[in-house]
């Protein structure tokens, strides 16, 4: 994965996630729109097989980079939780 910041202001962030698909972007978007600091979160992928998605975040004034970092941390926590639950189920 390669992430390029296309634009950033105090409350907006637009990033291109090279090589990513709907899988990661849907998870990020869903977590971001549940965050009370986020006013708008969406991504655009013009052509699924040949274009890289662009994620857009607008916050209430909170640093959008911190908001995106928090969403990434939540994904890691959810994956860790799934790994634990899955391991217990398999070993039961």
Swiss-Prot record:
Entry keywords, A to Z: Cytoplasm, DNA-directed RNA polymerase, Nucleotidyltransferase, Transcription, Transferase
Cellular compartment(s): Cytoplasm
Cellular component aspect of the GO annotation: cytoplasm; DNA-directed RNA polymerase complex
Cited InterPro entries: RBP11-like, RBP11-like_dimer, RNA_pol_Rpb11_13-16kDa_CS, Rpo11-like
UniProt-listed GO biological process terms: DNA-templated transcription
SUPFAM superfamilies: RBP11-like subunits of RNA polymerase (SSF55257)
Keyword Cytoplasm listed: yes
EC number(s) stated in the UniProt entry for this protein: 2.7.7.6
Ranges in a coiled coil: none
Single Gene Ontology MF annotation: DNA binding
UniProt catalytic activity: RNA(n) + a ribonucleoside 5'-triphosphate = RNA(n+1) + diphosphate
Keyword Cytoplasm assigned: yes
Assembly with partners or alone: Part of the RNA polymerase complex.
Functional summary from the UniProt entry: DNA-dependent RNA polymerase (RNAP) catalyzes the transcription of DNA into RNA using the four ribonucleoside triphosphates as substrates.
UniProt cross-references to HAMAP family, sorted A to Z: RNApol_arch_Rpo11
Similarity comment: Belongs to the archaeal Rpo11/eukaryotic RPB11/RPC19 RNA polymerase subunit family.
Protein name: DNA-directed RNA polymerase subunit Rpo11
Source lineage: Archaea, Methanobacteriati, Methanobacteriota, Stenosarchaea group, Methanomicrobia
Gene assigned in the entry: rpo11
